[in-house]
Amino acid sequence: MKLNKTVLAICLVSFNLHAANLVYSANQNDNTVSVVDADKYKKVGSLTLGYPAGDKRLYSPLYNGEINVHGLSYAKQRRELSVVSTVTNSVVRFDTNTGKKIDTIYVGRNPHEPRYTNNEDEIWVTVRGENYISIIDSQTGNEKKRIELESGPGMVTFSHDDKYAYISSSFDEHLWIVDTKTKKVIKKLMMPSSFSPFINTTPDGKEVWVDHKDVGEITRISTKDNEIIETFKTGKISNHFAFANNKAYVTVGGENSVNIYDYGEKHAKLIKKIQAETLPHGIWADTKGSKVYFVNELSNTLQIIDADSDKIIAKLPVGAL
């Protein structure tokens, strides 16, 4: 059985399971995770974590479901999906072979995004309502360590060798670089923004990119020396980005577009804009770099881009994003 993975947020994750290319989308307004067959462009199921927003049962003293299902991370070898719900302060893990819940882990106020280390031994969760990273042992599901920071962290990504973790902030200009072995901050970089909710590593591992949603910019960091390469303008309400076919795809909510950049040189260059629906947000590419999937927050749709032609080839409804 071969598995490949992709992740998007408000979140989307895709991977190959039993020869079906599946995409998972976290839907924060109906508290579900949509399951999409990416080859047939069809929603094939959902994982229900709670009642939808507005349902009076959410306020029951006996309610034990999740609220504001938001962040996803997938472990390829473990066949495991972690789902963060920001209001109920939880990480729910699912067995992706069966679709059954493994456990629920409570990590602290307003977690944002989970991320498995590349070796899948740990799950690092940014607890941005407080000021720390919650590190979960993926074998036991127990929290093993907290890394305290100056402010609430937004998201974490790793170098390909798992030596360093790069952590953005949701509340100030810090970006922290952490030694994953000692769990100590070894360097801090200052960003041009106090709201940097999304971060990821390029497919070749040479760079880490950080999105600055409030100012519509992205910063590129070299993983060789952990220094800033450049910060470039992307557009109002720049949400997330993905990499495919040696290009970067950025969802720009204020323009309802996906902006495509060539980043082969020192300065990223805009090469095309693709019109999206309403407020494009989460975006990720498949492992082959042939397709890019993104969700539109206000139209509750998933659209698929062919990375060769850079044209939208499919659209389908998902849950209430």
Task: Name the predicted role of every residue range.
Residues 12, 18-321:
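Predominantly soluble domains enriched in secretory-pathway, periplasmic, or organellar proteins
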